[in-house]
């Protein structure tokens, strides 16, 4: 199974949301300096949730791990998870894969969010051309502009939307890491009204 959607995932989503918003968030540059490992993503993220609270971290990571095991039939996996905030000043996201992991998941944590601010999954129409942009930094910077606001022509040439997943409070979305995907519209200006998700990265033990 490549994708799975579970509504009403957490038994106490309001408490988790309130607690998440109390945490310290970092941008990608700050995270790169803190962890001594280059990373690049829009908006702000917290530390790994297990470091924020071991009880919650253990509960939610175990739940997601069990679901992935049933989906894939694979035993033994590693999982990392963070809260992420993005707002209207973060522009438009870009279509990408998470090729360094086996599965990704995200949990929407905005009550009454506009459904159009969810996630789109894509088919890539020209993998060779898309991959060619990965060869150097200028190409990578170009990739980050392939969206519905900047390089629309190339966006429409390279990608066809396959699934549009609505942003629904307490909805968990799971998909394989090699699926092309993109966050849809960002919103808000403050912690309280920005797009809040909990993201998960899952890797099978070799």
Show which residues each predicted segment covers.
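Catalytic core of non-heme Fe(II) oxygenases with the double-stranded beta-helix
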Residues: 88-206
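Non-heme Fe(II)/2-oxoglutarate
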Residues: 1-85, 89-93, 118, 125, ...
């Amino acid at each position: 199974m490549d994708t799975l959607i579970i509504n009403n995932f957490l038994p106490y989503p309001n408490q988790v949301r309130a607690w998440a918003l109390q945490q310290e968030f970092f941008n990608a540059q700050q995270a790169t300096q803190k962890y001594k490992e280059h990373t690049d993503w829009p908006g702000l993220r917290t530390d790994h949730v297990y470091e924020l609270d071991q009880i919650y971290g253990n509960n939610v990571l175990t739940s997601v791990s069990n679901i992935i095991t049933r989906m894939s039939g694979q035993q033994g996996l590693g999982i990392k998870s963070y809260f992420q905030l993005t707002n209207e000043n973060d522009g438009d996201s870009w279509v990408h894969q998470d090729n360094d992991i086996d599965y990704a998941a995200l949990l929407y944590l905005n009550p009454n969010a506009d459904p159009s601010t969810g996630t789109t999954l894509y088919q890539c129409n020209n993998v060779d051309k898309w991959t060619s942009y990965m060869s150097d930094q200028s190409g990578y910077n170009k990739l980050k502009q392939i969206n519905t606001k900047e390089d629309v022509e190339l966006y429409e040439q390279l990608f066809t939307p396959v699934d549009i997943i609505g942003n629904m409070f307490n909805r968990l979305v799971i998909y394989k890491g090699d699926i092309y995907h993109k966050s849809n519209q960002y919103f808000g200006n403050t912690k309280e009204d920005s797009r809040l998700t909990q993201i998960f990265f899952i890797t099978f033990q070799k």
